[in-house]
């Protein structure tokens, strides 16, 4: 994903590499299609103009098809879920564990009633680039502890998830497609076939905005994180550079702040989240620096039960009849995160393995950078899909 494959891989190893690439593409392609503001920001980094104010054209189809092999690199992919019916974070994790991903740590977000695990990509040579860096992103998967919600919100989720065979026995299969396990057929999250009632959605939104997002989007990508340290040029400002592992020029920045400034300036005018009190979230050790855009929005068709005849107590999950109507509502979709992993003190990299030396700075391998995740950072990043960020972002 981040660069050329090591030389002399066996046919079996090449097949493993292609299979994992295809799985990641299966998530990323619909993610970009559903979130036009996210795609525009990614396009700007992939195909920049010659100046910071030049209009940035959309990717042509041929260029879009190259995205997954030529982009400078995803830091991680993130998913949300409910801890129900053998689903939860394990349903998504199983999709990646079969490709060699391994769990490296757990995080707990008490106020949000959420647990998470992060997974490292395969360590095998086939999953690395020619420099030895991981060629595939980390994985961050979380789920909501449904039993910790108020009764009315818990019952909405149990009505949707707890009675659905697809969300249990076949959860991983649906997760592979980024589908909605509790819909009729694991369909595209943007389709109006899921038959979620507006009052159900609002009940969840009031109890947990994480829950409301997950009800609508299921196992779709919550966000992709760009490895900004792979964009860096060790000088001030921004310049256009030709990647060693791509025919495409790309932006390179002196800092995470410079990257954000570029994205926020016209013509992009990207909205960034300030959840947690600031735009850039920094770990206590200073080694992990993160920021995110405000989530895109998606028009979703909900069942409006406000006109249901009095005394009719049937739930939406039992079917839709002539007395119910659809109403459209804009809901938070997905966002893009930007991550800067600083070099570990005393491990600044190897000048003899310096792919960026010509740009004025030594290449620092990924193994010499701050790894993992930080609870406080992630807690704030979660809120990129919250309504307050839509208003204030």
Regions found by a protein language model. Name each.
Residues 4-93, 98-393:
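Extended, well-ordered protein cores
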């Amino acid at each position: 994903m981040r660069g050329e494959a090591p030389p002399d891989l066996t046919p079996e190893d090449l097949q493993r590499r292609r299979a994992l690439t295809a799985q990641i593409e299966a998530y990323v392609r619909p993610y970009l299609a559903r979130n036009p503001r996210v795609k525009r920001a990614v396009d700007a980094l992939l195909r920049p103009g010659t100046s910071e104010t030049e209009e940035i054209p959309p990717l042509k189809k041929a260029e879009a098809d190259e995205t997954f092999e030529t982009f400078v690199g995803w830091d991680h992919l993130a998913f949300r879920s409910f801890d129900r019916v053998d689903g939860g974070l394990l349903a998504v994790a199983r999709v990646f564990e079969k490709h060699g991903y391994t769990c490296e740590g757990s995080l707990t977000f008490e106020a949000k009633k959420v647990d998470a695990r992060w997974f490292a990509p395969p360590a095998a040579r086939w999953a690395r680039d020619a420099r030895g860096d991981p060629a595939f992103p980390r994985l961050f998967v979380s789920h909501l502890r449904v039993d910790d919600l108020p009764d009315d919100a818990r019952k909405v989720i149990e009505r949707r998830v707890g009675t659905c065979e697809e969300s249990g026995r076949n959860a991983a299969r649906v997760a592979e497609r980024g589908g909605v396990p509790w819909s009729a057929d694991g369909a595209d999250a943007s389709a109006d076939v899921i038959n979620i009632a507006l009052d159900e959605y609002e009940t969840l939104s009031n109890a947990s905005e994480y829950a409301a997002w997950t009800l609508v989007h299921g196992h779709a990508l919550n966000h992709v994180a760009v490895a900004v340290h792979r964009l860096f040029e060790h000088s001030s400002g921004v310049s256009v550079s030709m990647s060693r592992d791509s025919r495409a020029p790309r932006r390179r920045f002196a800092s995470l702040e410079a990257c954000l400034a570029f994205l926020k300036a016209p013509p992009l005018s990207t909205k960034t989240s300030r959840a947690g009190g600031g735009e850039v979230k920094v770990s206590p050790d200073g080694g992990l620096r993160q920021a995110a855009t405000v989530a895109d929005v998606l028009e979703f068709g909900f069942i409006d039960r406000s006109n249901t005849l009095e005394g009719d107590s049937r739930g939406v999950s039992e079917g839709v009849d002539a007395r119910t109507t659809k109403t459209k509502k804009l809901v938070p979709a997905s966002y893009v995160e930007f991550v800067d992993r600083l070099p570990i003190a005393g491990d600044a990299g190897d000048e003899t393995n310096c792919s960026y030396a010509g740009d004025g700075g030594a290449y620092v391998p990924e193994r010499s950078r701050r790894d993992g995740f930080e609870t406080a950072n992630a807690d704030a990043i979660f809120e990129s899909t919250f309504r307050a960020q839509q208003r204030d972002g």
